[in-house]
Amino acid sequence: MTLFNTARILRQEPVAGEIPPAKSLLRDTVQVAWPSIIESFLVALVGFIDTIMVSVLGSYAIAAVGLTQQPKFIGIAVFMAMSTAISALVARRRGEKNRESAVQILRMCILVTVILTAIISVVCVAFADPIIRFAGSAEDTHEAAVEYFQVIMGGIVFTTVMMIINAAQRGAGNTKIAMRTNIVSNLVNIVFNYLLIGGNFGFPELGTRGAAIATVIGSVVGCAMSIASMFSKQSFVFIRGVRGWIASRFDIRSLLNVGTSAFVEQIFMRIGFLLFAITVANLGTTQYAAHQIGMNMMSLSFSF
């Protein structure tokens, strides 16, 4: 069965050093991967819990929140692509033991993220009405969906900055940091969902707007934790002691090479999801709410 062996089609390279045993490689892989697995599962689980907590308002609320998801993901597609690129580049720089280059890449990505997010946020808040209408809103979901979308996109900068920093930490092998920030962020989100959706313990009853505010508050806490992680001396991307906010031309070119293909993949995937969501939304509010519940349950199955 050597016909399908990769050694037949790949150019052989001399071994640079001793290859670790398979048992050691498996142990190291699990050690790095398990925090990311838990993080991914909890993010999907919290999305499911969010749906349950909003459902007390009725099927219109589930549908309204669901309508905002794909427009939001299209808005942050560039940052999802950037996080893929920065994770890959920081991992390379760690292998090269080039901390200065890794920190400069991270700093530049944070700067670009803040500027781009500000622009996208303003556009989405200003044009929330036509965006949500295009996404397939109905008379009973439109107002709640617009309100939710405006709050979420108004505070999306905390999500994008956290996303970029956590991606860099994953690339540096610090997957536990990303896990902790997401766990705390999601727990804060759930607590404020309970306080603000139904108006418990003296808090105002804000409905879907309360769910959006809870999400933003959770993102603020998570973002603060991510920023704090860059000031830890144990972190490979410890930002003190490194000057400059602009990476080298070589690093910028590498970011674009990795990020461009990731962005194209993200944008087309999200457009496909949006078109599918619009099709389902046209069936009616109750049908779309059922679809949203099903999608949240399905996300648990591939969160690992």
Description of each model-found segment:
Residues R27-S87, N257-V280:
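Signature of the first transmembrane helix
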Residues I37, F41, L45, I49, ...:
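Generic alpha-helical transmembrane segments of integral inner-membrane proteins
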